[in-house]
Design a protein with these regions (language model features):
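A local structural motif
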Residues: 72-78
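A conserved active-site cap/scaffold subdomain adjacent to cofactor or substrate pockets
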Residues: 87-114
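Flexible, glycine-rich active-site loops centered on histidine and acidic residues
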Residues: 1-58, 99, 105-107
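An alpha-helical appendage that flanks or caps ligand/catalytic pockets
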Residues: 36-69, 109-197
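Acidic (Asp/Glu)-rich catalytic clusters
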Residues: 6-12, 91-96, 118-130
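Glycine-rich beta-alpha junction loops
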Residues: 19-21, 83-86, 105-109, 139-145
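Structural preference for beta-strand elements that scaffold enzyme active sites
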Residues: 12-16, 78-80, 98-100, 134-136
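Catalytic alpha/beta core domains of metabolic enzymes, predominantly
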Residues: 5, 43, 80, 87, ...
């Protein structure tokens, strides 16, 4: 589908690829049906295979020897390596890919983000798709006319983060219900990747 989108809109399609399963462990296991399929050891090879299928062939004997993404586009979608760790930052730099840091993860901090970007820049090697490092950050941002209003609106998300860290998956509540919750003070003290103001 990404090859089709790129053929329809050349130079306007980005593809974000990351190691994370995109869900909780139980759901990932149900979808992949094997604990072996959950490992990250094969990720660099899988990434190179995908890059090859989309036209960026850097190694010999990959999936692209047998398969072709169709339609064959004149250009390839830009692949961004998504990550929340130094490993992903270094891999993106090594392959000369754009990097997107997941600051929005609940455990993200400014220092984690800066450290990942420094690793990315230090490991960056120019590639067929990128001459210089290109990094972006994904963050949960909540804004309102005043800081007080933003903090009020952020209450449900803060409580949800606290519940998830405790292994509970609860429905999100209204800002009014969150404001009355005794756990909100603790939720505000958690280190999160949210920017509120």
């Amino acid at each position: 589908q990404f090859a089709m989108l790129e053929a329809l809109h050349p130079g306007r399609i980005d593809v974000g690829i990351g190691r994370a399963p995109g869900t909780d462990g139980q759901t990932a296991m149900a979808l992949r049906r094997s604990a072996d399929a959950l490992g990250a050891e094969d990720f660099p090879r899988q990434l190179l295979d995908l890059m090859g299928l989309l036209g960026d062939i850097r190694t010999e004997h990959g999936l692209w020897d047998r398969f072709r993404a169709t339609p064959v586009a004149v250009t390839s979608p830009m692949i961004f390596l998504l990550g929340s760790s130094g490993y992903s930052a270094e891999l993106a730099g090594h392959l000369g890919l754009p990097f997107s840091f997941a600051h929005h993860f609940d455990l993200g901090s400014r220092d984690d983000t800066l450290r990942a970007f420094a690793l990315y820049r230090n490991r960056f090697r120019p590639s067929p798709v990128l001459d210089a490092p290109f990094a972006i950050v994904s963050a949960n941002v909540l804004v309102a006319p005043t800081v007080e209003e933003a903090e009020f609106e952020a209450g449900p998300g803060r409580l949800l983060a606290l519940a998830r860290r405790s292994g509970r998956f609860e429905p999100i509540v209204s800002p009014e219900v969150a404001a009355a919750d005794p756990g909100l003070a603790m939720a505000r003290s958690l280190r999160t990747g949210r920017l509120v103001g």
